Amino acid sequence: MKQPMSLKINPPTTPLFIARMFFPLIAIALLSVQIHAQTSYKFDFGVSTNAAVAGYTKVTPANKYTTAYANDNTNGTFGFEDWDSTAWGAFSRGAASDNLNRDFIYTRSHNGFSSFYFSVRVPEGKYTVTFYIGDPGDTSTTNIKAESRRFLVENLRLAKGQLATRTFTVIRREPAIAGGGTVGLDYSYGREDPSICLNWDHKLTFEFSGARPCIGGLDIVPVDSGITFHMCGNSTLVEQEDEPWSCWGAFVHRFFNSSIIVNDLASSGLTSSSFLSQRRLAKICSVMKPGDYLFFEFGHNDSKGSVSQSQFEANMKTYYDSATSHQATMVFVTPTARSGDSDSSTSIGNYAQYTRDYAKTLSGAKLVDLNAAVIHMKTALGAAAYGGNGKAIYCYASASNQWPDLPAGASDDTHFCDFGGYELAKWVSHTGLKAAGIDLRKYLLDTTAFDPDKPDLKSAWIFPYSIDTVFRHASPGGTVFKDTVSAVSDVASGGSIPSLLRSISVNHGSFTILYSGYLTGKAEISVFSMSGKTMARKVMVLEKNSRAIAWKELNGLPAGVYFIRMQVNNSALGKSAFFKL
């Protein structure tokens, strides 16, 4: 195994290395770099022939955040997440020693998959991050996200030679709670599994995407100041790990400057009670400070019978008491409306109204009526002037190969797409908070009010999705990593139950697909390019007691990134897997 490159920082130190274990199947040897723990982390992106700007650490495409050293917990380990290094690289406009933008990392492709990811192992805490953006010799268009798709920079278009900086403050958190205990993470489907989920994987990760993102460097500085929005909620507020779903909590950062920090501990399936039992509020209370805001948005799961009105109101009081005891402001948010809701007073089994009514009884509590705003918004979007699609904010995806885990598409009348999450966050940030008596306008990047009766045009909204949530790590040379997988229902014939897709290996063009459980019946295996083009297809009959499929006819595929989907008796066998040749 190759030893990773080390970078000497004064005082010298013996390099130790850490890995993110996306999938514990295979340890891979890639170049990795570790730097001595320090107060700030400053990186100069570019080519190896240019020396680093004084005070910065040079980073080139050779510096990969490897999974080969999973047992190390050394802060300062850094590198690029290597999902497809053919799509991005380094470029130099000169060797000036005092200009971070004279060389940079950028994407070569313009096909919608123009992304690269950079990760740094840092201690838990708040960090102000400054990005150095642009190309001295060409145009650039850059989007930036942090962790699990927290949106920071939106389509920053810079003219030839134009350079810019953007600064935000983000949180890196751990499940452990100061004083004892841990947050009860959701490991189902890998949602909050620290080996997969960017929000919980012990490092800060930034995603750069767009038509031509150009990043010359970045500063990461630990801070203890700022106003934090602590988010308590369910899947309508969570920072969704996987496309094409999204929620408003992931977009709030986009509209505020670095004085506002979002700490979103919402998680799918939670009620106002289970959020407490998973010690998520306890985690928030361990870091909440005077001047912070505690947001509460529940009701969707409470209304399904597990939490009565009286218990819901008692829970509201618990959250309120926690906020006031920390000299923070309590903000109750009515639960988002479903696409079929038209009456805000009865929406979500009356829990929107319960939230309104009980919030009025608590002194100093604020109310953001998001439920009513969503109903206005979807009504407006249904008008011809806005495209005539009232469901435009919800997660609908047509049957295609764009989403390999959704071969039949998606029709979700509860959860939101990226556009929906963006629109809701824009309304909360620009209008909802002010209407609730919370004046944070001086922290907004744009103070223009947002009217839910006059939403943005979805057709004019450009937003690249996060490729890392569609395709997980793949190593050079053909090794395959599986995505998180889940069992599906009984197949149509024979009653066999497809269990978990275990792994796929590639050796000189021959695929071996391993799966647990015993399957019988018709199997269909398809290989697609990242643009969705079918590259190969195999239909075969599975023999009883079989646990593996060999496929030797793929050695003609050109080098590139592909995904493979397996179906048995027309039922998808877990999620798709991705590989690189």
What are the roles of these predicted feature ranges?
Residues 482-510, 518, 533:
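Residue-level detector of functionally pivotal "anchor" positions at catalytic/ligand-binding pockets or at interdomain
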Residues 492-496, 537-542, 550-555, 559-581:
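C-terminal tail/sorting-segment detector
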Residues 221, 226-318, 450-481:
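Conserved SGNH/GDSL esterase-like catalytic core that processes O-acyl groups on lipids
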Residues 44, 228-233, 237-238, 261-266, ...:
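Structural recognition of the beta-strand scaffold that forms the well-ordered cores
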Residues 38-243:
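Compositionally biased, intrinsically disordered or flexible polar/acidic segments
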Residues 38-41, 385-486:
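Conserved catalytic region of serine esterases and O-acyltransferases that act on ester linkages
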Residues 421, 528-535, 562:
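Short, glycine-anchored, charge-dense loop/turn motifs used at functional sites
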Residues 337-376:
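Substrate-gating cap/lid alpha-helix
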